Regions:
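Sec-dependent bacterial lipoprotein signal peptides
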Residues: 1-16
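Function-determining sites in protein domains
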Residues: 17-235
Length: 235
C-alpha cells in the first residue's frame, strides 16, 4: 500500500498548494493559507532568469480582514502587475459560504499595472523597512493581531521577513501606505489598533462556549530558518 500512501500524500500537498482564485473559495483558502502566506509557490518557482515576484500579506486580525498583494515584474521598464486581494473577515468555512450565498462576497480582487516609477518607489520602501535583513528567529505571528509578512523571489534569490504590531519599525514601514493607495479593491484597510490578549481570549471563549474550541479560529505562525511554520496548518 506504499503507492496508495504516496498518492494520498501527493493529493494532500496539491490541495494545500496556492492556486489562482484560491483565496476566494473558503475551503481552498483554509487549506492553502499557510502556503500562500509563506510564499511557498514563490520559493518553489524561484530561479535565475524568471521574473521577480513579491507577496505581501497584511493580517489585520484574521477574522476581520486580510489583504494579499502579489507583484510580478514585467519586462524591464514596463513596471509590474499588481493583484490585490482582500478577504473581508475570514470566518468559519460554513459561515463564509452562507455569506456568499446571501450575496455578501467575502473576497474582493483587483488587478492593475504599476508603472516603473511607482514600482521603484514601492520596492525602495520595502527595502527601507529592512526586508533584506534576516528575519527574527522564533518570531510569533498570531492571527488575532496585526502583522505584515513578505516573501519574494528577486533575481533568483528567495527571501522572507515579517513585522508585527508593537515592533518599532511597524509604525514606519512606508510600503504599507503605498500599497493601500495602489489597491483598487475599494475596501478600506483595517488599521492597526491595540489588542488586549486576555480580552481576545475571553471573547473567543465566549463565542465557542468556553469548550475545547475556545480558541475559535485563532492560530499562529512561527518564523524559523527563514520560513514560517505552524502546527495548525502543517508544514
Amino acid at each position: 500500500l506504499r503507492w496508495l500512501s504516496a498518492v494520498i500524500a501527493s493529493l494532500l500537498l496539491a490541495a494545500c498548494a496556492p492556486t489562482p482564485g484560491g483565496l476566494s473559495d473558503p475551503i481552498r483558502r483554509k487549506a492553502q493559507w499557510h502556503a500562500t502566506a509563506g510564499g511557498d509557490d514563490l520559493r518553489a518557482g524561484c530561479a535565475a532568469g524568471r521574473p521577480s515576484r513579491w507577496r505581501l500579506v497584511y493580517n489585520s486580525v484574521w477574522d476581520e480582514q486580510v489583504r494579499v498583494y502579489d507583484i510580478e515584474r514585467l519586462p524591464a521598464g514596463e513596471g509590474a502587475r499588481l493583484v490585490s486581494t482582500v478577504v473581508q473577515g475570514a470566518p468559519r468555512v460554513l459561515q463564509a459560504y452562507l455569506m456568499q450565498l446571501g450575496g455578501q462576497p467575502t473576497t474582493r480582487v483587483a488587478e492593475s499595472r504599476l508603472p516603473e516609477p511607482q514600482l521603484s518607489a514601492l520596492l525602495r520602501a520595502i527595502d527601507g523597512a529592512g526586508f533584506a535583513r534576516p528575519p527574527e528567529e522564533g518570531m510569533r505571528l498570531v492571527s488575532w493581531d496585526f502583522y505584515w509578512l513578505a516573501s519574494a523571489c528577486v533575481d533568483g534569490t528567495w527571501h522572507l521577513n515579517a513585522w508585527r504590531r508593537g515592533d518599532p519599525v511597524f509604525q514606519r514601514l512606508g510600503f504599507d501606505e503605498l500599497l493601500f493607495a495602489l489597491d483598487q479593491t475599494g475596501v478600506e484597510p483595517n488599521r492597526p489598533r491595540a489588542i488586549d490578549p486576555a480580552r481576545r481570549a475571553l471573547e473567543a471563549g465566549e463565542q465557542a462556549g468556553g469548550g475545547r474550541g475556545s480558541r475559535d479560529e485563532s492560530f499562529e505562525f512561527v518564523v524559523r530558518d527563514g520560513r514560517i511554520w505552524s502546527p495548525g496548518f502543517g508544514n
